[in-house]
């Protein structure tokens, strides 16, 4: 377990070092585990989001989601801009460190949040289901726990 944790931490730093050269966002998501995320703007209407996660604290997965910025509201013009983003993508990873099952699935995203005007920070409440198959390690079958993936995110934009 210590070796896996060390590999995870080293991978995280390497992942963030490579991606930090872009001028977009990095963040942390708490929900169905812990996720480190990177957001890469493609245009003013869409972006890619990549996460490195520990689903159910039982494995390690990578998710990529193509998102659309579908709605914007100016409910609190002095403090923040409110938004709704939706997206679709895929996930793969290891499920259950002890038995090494492989996870392959489809991911979705629906995020409601606010981007603060006076600080490069945004907060989100989201639903990000991952539905697919777990193969090997005695866990062959449908990955249904990923269907209940609600979370809170904080992002730092740069």
Label every model-predicted segment.
Residues 42-127:
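Gram-negative (and chloroplast) outer-membrane scaffold detector with strong preference
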Residues 23, 96-98, 136-141:
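Extracellular loop and loop/strand-boundary signature of outer-membrane beta-barrel proteins
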Residues 1-4, 20:
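Positively charged n-region of N-terminal signal peptides that target proteins for export
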Residues 15-21:
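Sec/Tat signal peptide C-region and signal peptidase I cleavage site
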Residues 4-15:
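Sec-dependent N-terminal signal peptides
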Residues 117-158:
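Predominantly the C-terminal beta-signal and adjacent terminal strand-loop region
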Residues 22-24, 30-34, 58-62, 82, ...:
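Residues that define the transmembrane beta-barrel architecture of outer-membrane proteins
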Residues 9, 37-39, 65-67, 109-111, ...:
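Outer-membrane beta-barrel architecture
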């Amino acid at each position: 377990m210590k070796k896996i944790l060390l590999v995870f931490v080293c991978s995280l730093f390497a992942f963030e070092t490579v991606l930090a050269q872009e001028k977009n966002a990095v963040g942390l998501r708490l929900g169905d585990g812990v996720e480190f995320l990177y957001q890469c703007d493609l245009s003013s209407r869409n972006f890619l989001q990549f996460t490195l996660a520990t689903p159910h604290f039982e494995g390690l997965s990578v998710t990529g989601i193509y998102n659309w910025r579908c709605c914007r509201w100016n409910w609190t013009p002095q403090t923040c801009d409110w938004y709704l983003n939706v997206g679709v993508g895929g996930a793969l990873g290891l499920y259950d460190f002890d038995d090494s099952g492989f996870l392959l699935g489809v991911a979705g995203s629906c995020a409601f949040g606010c981007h603060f005007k006076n600080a490069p920070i945004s907060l989100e409440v989201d639903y990000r289901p991952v539905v697919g198959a777990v193969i090997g390690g005695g866990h062959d079958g449908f990955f249904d726990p990923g269907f209940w993936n609600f979370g809170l995110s904080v992002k730092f934009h740069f």
